[in-house]
Protein backbone atom coordinates (compact mmCIF):
# COMPACT_ATOMS: atom_id res chain seq x y z
CA UNK A 1 0.00 0.00 0.00
CA UNK A 2 1.35 3.45 -0.89
CA UNK A 3 0.05 4.98 2.33
CA UNK A 4 2.28 2.83 4.56
CA UNK A 5 5.20 5.25 4.34
CA UNK A 6 3.28 8.31 5.55
CA UNK A 7 4.27 9.94 8.82
CA UNK A 8 1.77 10.26 11.65
CA UNK A 9 1.63 14.00 11.10
CA UNK A 10 0.85 13.52 7.39
CA UNK A 11 -1.88 11.00 8.21
CA UNK A 12 -3.38 13.35 10.78
CA UNK A 13 -3.24 16.28 8.36
CA UNK A 14 -5.03 14.17 5.76
CA UNK A 15 -7.79 13.33 8.26
CA UNK A 16 -8.06 16.92 9.49
CA UNK A 17 -8.32 18.25 5.95
CA UNK A 18 -11.69 16.51 5.64
CA UNK A 19 -13.25 17.47 8.99
CA UNK A 20 -12.41 18.39 12.57
CA UNK A 21 -11.38 15.59 14.94
CA UNK A 22 -10.90 15.56 18.70
CA UNK A 23 -7.57 14.47 20.09
CA UNK A 24 -9.15 11.22 21.32
CA UNK A 25 -10.51 10.44 17.85
CA UNK A 26 -7.09 11.05 16.30
CA UNK A 27 -5.43 8.79 18.88
CA UNK A 28 -7.85 6.01 17.99
CA UNK A 29 -7.40 6.51 14.23
CA UNK A 30 -3.61 6.87 14.28
CA UNK A 31 -2.64 4.36 17.01
CA UNK A 32 -2.27 1.42 14.58
CA UNK A 33 0.35 3.39 12.62
CA UNK A 34 2.40 4.61 15.59
CA UNK A 35 5.52 2.81 16.80
CA UNK A 36 4.95 4.04 20.35
CA UNK A 37 2.47 6.00 22.39
CA UNK A 38 5.10 8.70 22.98
CA UNK A 39 5.57 9.15 19.23
CA UNK A 40 1.82 9.52 18.75
CA UNK A 41 1.45 12.00 21.61
CA UNK A 42 4.38 14.05 20.32
CA UNK A 43 2.83 14.26 16.85
CA UNK A 44 -0.56 15.25 18.28
CA UNK A 45 1.05 17.83 20.58
CA UNK A 46 2.78 19.35 17.55
CA UNK A 47 -0.52 19.49 15.64
CA UNK A 48 -2.27 21.15 18.58
CA UNK A 49 0.57 23.66 19.02
CA UNK A 50 0.35 24.66 15.36
CA UNK A 51 -3.46 24.90 15.70
CA UNK A 52 -4.19 22.16 13.17
CA UNK A 53 -6.16 20.25 15.78
CA UNK A 54 -8.31 21.84 18.45
CA UNK A 55 -10.93 20.26 20.69
CA UNK A 56 -12.45 23.74 21.18
CA UNK A 57 -12.85 24.24 17.44
CA UNK A 58 -14.29 20.72 17.08
CA UNK A 59 -16.86 21.38 19.83
CA UNK A 60 -17.96 24.73 18.35
CA UNK A 61 -18.24 23.25 14.85
CA UNK A 62 -20.08 20.16 16.12
CA UNK A 63 -22.56 22.25 18.14
CA UNK A 64 -23.14 24.55 15.19
CA UNK A 65 -23.68 21.79 12.63
CA UNK A 66 -25.86 19.52 14.77
CA UNK A 67 -27.44 22.14 17.04
CA UNK A 68 -30.58 22.69 15.01
CA UNK A 69 -31.41 18.99 14.86
CA UNK A 70 -30.52 17.83 18.37
CA UNK A 71 -30.87 19.12 21.92
CA UNK A 72 -28.04 20.18 24.18
CA UNK A 73 -28.15 16.95 26.19
CA UNK A 74 -27.53 14.77 23.17
CA UNK A 75 -24.87 17.09 21.79
CA UNK A 76 -23.07 17.11 25.16
CA UNK A 77 -23.22 13.31 25.38
CA UNK A 78 -21.83 12.85 21.87
CA UNK A 79 -19.02 15.32 22.56
CA UNK A 80 -18.17 13.55 25.84
CA UNK A 81 -17.95 10.25 23.94
CA UNK A 82 -15.51 11.88 21.55
CA UNK A 83 -13.27 13.05 24.38
CA UNK A 84 -14.20 16.71 24.75
CA UNK A 85 -13.88 18.01 28.32
CA UNK A 86 -16.86 19.42 30.24
CA UNK A 87 -15.73 23.06 30.22
CA UNK A 88 -15.28 23.03 26.45
CA UNK A 89 -18.70 21.42 26.00
CA UNK A 90 -20.35 23.99 28.26
CA UNK A 91 -18.71 26.83 26.33
CA UNK A 92 -19.65 25.37 22.92
CA UNK A 93 -23.28 24.90 23.95
CA UNK A 94 -23.66 28.27 25.68
CA UNK A 95 -25.50 29.79 22.72
CA UNK A 96 -27.68 26.73 22.10
CA UNK A 97 -31.40 27.57 21.99
CA UNK A 98 -33.08 24.26 22.79
CA UNK A 99 -36.59 25.69 22.65
CA UNK A 100 -36.22 27.04 19.11
CA UNK A 101 -34.54 23.84 17.90
CA UNK A 102 -37.17 21.63 19.53
CA UNK A 103 -39.97 23.68 18.03
CA UNK A 104 -38.42 23.47 14.57
CA UNK A 105 -37.93 19.69 14.78
CA UNK A 106 -41.44 19.25 16.16
CA UNK A 107 -42.90 21.44 13.40
CA UNK A 108 -41.09 19.46 10.67
CA UNK A 109 -42.24 16.11 12.02
CA UNK A 110 -45.72 16.79 13.39
CA UNK A 111 -46.91 20.35 12.85
CA UNK A 112 -49.93 20.15 15.14
CA UNK A 113 -50.56 19.60 18.81
CA UNK A 114 -51.30 16.04 19.95
CA UNK A 115 -54.96 15.03 19.94
CA UNK A 116 -54.70 12.31 22.58
CA UNK A 117 -52.35 10.87 25.19
CA UNK A 118 -50.84 8.29 22.82
CA UNK A 119 -49.95 10.95 20.27
CA UNK A 120 -48.54 13.18 23.01
CA UNK A 121 -46.34 10.32 24.22
CA UNK A 122 -45.15 9.70 20.66
CA UNK A 123 -44.25 13.36 20.15
CA UNK A 124 -42.57 13.51 23.58
CA UNK A 125 -40.43 10.45 22.75
CA UNK A 126 -39.45 11.94 19.41
CA UNK A 127 -38.08 15.08 21.05
CA UNK A 128 -36.55 13.23 24.01
CA UNK A 129 -34.60 10.93 21.69
CA UNK A 130 -33.09 14.01 20.11
CA UNK A 131 -31.76 15.17 23.47
CA UNK A 132 -34.12 17.97 24.36
CA UNK A 133 -34.72 18.58 28.10
CA UNK A 134 -38.10 17.62 29.56
CA UNK A 135 -39.10 21.21 30.40
CA UNK A 136 -38.47 22.28 26.80
CA UNK A 137 -40.49 19.34 25.47
CA UNK A 138 -43.39 20.20 27.78
CA UNK A 139 -43.30 23.81 26.54
CA UNK A 140 -43.37 22.73 22.90
CA UNK A 141 -46.21 20.26 23.44
CA UNK A 142 -48.23 22.71 25.56
CA UNK A 143 -48.25 25.25 22.78
CA UNK A 144 -46.35 27.91 24.72
CA UNK A 145 -47.01 31.63 24.30
CA UNK A 146 -46.11 31.62 20.61
CA UNK A 147 -49.66 31.66 19.14
CA UNK A 148 -48.69 32.14 15.50
CA UNK A 149 -46.34 29.18 15.77
CA UNK A 150 -49.18 26.66 15.84
CA UNK A 151 -50.96 27.07 12.56
CA UNK A 152 -53.64 24.66 11.36
Curated annotation (Swiss-Prot):
Major subcellular location class: cytoplasm
Keyword Zinc: no
GO biological process: regulation of DNA repair
Subcellular location, record wording: Cytoplasm
Keywords, ordered alphabetically: Cytoplasm
Superkingdom field: Bacteria
GO CC terms in record: cytoplasm
Keyword Cytoplasm found: yes
NCBIfam families for this protein: PRK00117.2-5
HAMAP family: RecX (MF_01114)
The protein's role, per its UniProt record: Modulates RecA activity.
PANTHER family: REGULATORY PROTEIN RECX FAMILY PROTEIN (PTHR33602:SF1)
Record-stated family: Belongs to the RecX family.
Protein name: Regulatory protein RecX
Amino acid sequence: MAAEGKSLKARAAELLSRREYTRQELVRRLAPFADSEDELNAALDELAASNWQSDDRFARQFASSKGTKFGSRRLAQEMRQRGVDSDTIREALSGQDDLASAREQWRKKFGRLPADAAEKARQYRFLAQRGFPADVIRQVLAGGADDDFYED
